[in-house]
Each structure stands twice: as C-alpha cells, then as structure tokens.
Amino acid sequence: MKFIFFDLDGTLLPMVQDDFVRCYYKLLTTKMSKFGVEPKKLIDALNYGAYQMTNNDGTMTNEERFWICYEKIMGISKDTYINELNEFYETEFNEAIVSTKPDPLARKIIDVLHDKGYQVVLATSPLFPQSAIYNRIRWAGLTPEDFVLITTYEKYHYCKPNLGYYQEILDNLNIKQEGYLMIGNDIGEDLSSKLAGFRTYLVTDYIENRANMSYKPDMKGSLQDLYEYLKQL
C-alpha cells in the first residue's frame, strides 16, 4: 500500500500558529471563567500540559500526561469540569476557525491522492483530544474519513519532534519505513521525520521555525506547488 503523511495546522489548515492559540485560549478562558476558573491559572495548566506532552516518554498516553499536569497546576480533579471542557471542544472551539485561513486546495490535494490510490495519514502532533482535531479537520474542508489514521492525544504516547511519535504511527499502521513522504510546515516538528527515514516536503506558506533552525527538506514549495507536484506522482 502507498502512504503519504500530512501535518494539519499550517499545512492542510493554513494558519499562523500564534494567532490560533491566542484565539483558542480566549474562547476557552471566557467559557471557563463563568464557572469561576481563573484564566491565568487555566492557561498555565494548558501550557504546562503541552510542554510535558511534547516531552512525553512513552510511559503513558498524552491524555494521561496532560491531566496529571492539569491537576497539579489547577489544584482540582480533572472531573470537576470535564463535562464543560468536553462541551467546549464540541461547540465554542469551532469559533476559532476565524484565526485560520482554510484553502480549497486542501480538498483538491486529498482527492488527487485518493484517486491515485494513496492512503493518507494525518500526522498532527497529538496535543488535543479527538473532538478538537476532528473539528479542525472539518475547518480545512476535509473529513476524518479522508484519513486512514489520525493521531490524537487519547491514543499516542509521544509528540513531534520525538522520533518515537513517527515510529508509533508506523507500528499502528503495521508497516515498515520505506521512505514515506511527510508533508508539513514546521521546521522543528515535521522535518525531524527525516531522522526517522521519511522524505520531507516543506510547505512554505506558513513556515514555523521557532528555534530558528537550519533546514534542508527534500522538497519545498507553496500549497499550490505541492498540489502540482502530487498530481504528477
């Protein structure tokens, strides 16, 4: 079988990451402040949880790692507001689409790959629950059914750029590395897949390079360039 791997944020769903995070945090803190939750403490819990998930060592899922961090910072059980948080990701979270720039090319890209018989993997760093990731897929004009596998925090034990993340995907697909193509916009996170044997395509419309790293992808270009390239496969 033929596989191609995609990042989501900034790639299939064009966005400036910081703009999205600010919008997301504002929406969440606005909702939770109605229940007496202090916004700063909640943001601290989210940031600490994200940091620890990014550095997860494989001994527990990212979801389990996050809630340990959340309870430590918030000083309350995760069960206190679990229903409200789950509801947020199903409802108000969708308002954050205004911080993104959906492009019809995403739909065309996935369709052309399906027409060519490719299995498409959504290799988005699993920092979010499934509901939040599925909704962002829909913002991009896609559906969860477009992908043979989607990485969410409920099921994964690592995050990008940990090589364990990429190996976990291969293991879950029950495939061996054969130089599969990883497509993304983040220098540190997506291009790290080269160390796991992937070929890389850097989408340049919304490059993220927080650590100001030097980089040399196998290929690079805009989302339009990517579409033209994939049509020729």
Predicted regions and their residues:
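Short histidine/acidic/glycine/proline-rich micro-motifs that form metal-
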Residues: 12-14, 52-53, 124-128, 155-156
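Active-site neighborhood of HAD-like aspartate-dependent phosphohydrolases
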Residues: 1-45
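A metal-dependent, Asp-based hydrolase signature
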Residues: 47-90
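Short, acidic loop-to-helix structural element flanking the phosphoryl-transfer center
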Residues: 61, 80-83, 90-121
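Hydrophobic alpha-helical core bundles mediating ligand binding, dimerization, or RNAP-core interactions
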Residues: 21-29, 46-50, 67, 85-93, ...
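Short, solvent-exposed loop/turn segments at secondary-structure boundaries
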Residues: 16-19, 57, 214-215
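Short, flexible loop segments at the rims of nucleotide/cofactor-binding pockets, characterized by
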Residues: 96-100, 129, 157
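Asp-based, Mg2+/Mn2+-dependent phosphohydrolase catalytic module
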Residues: 1-4, 111-112, 125-127, 133-233
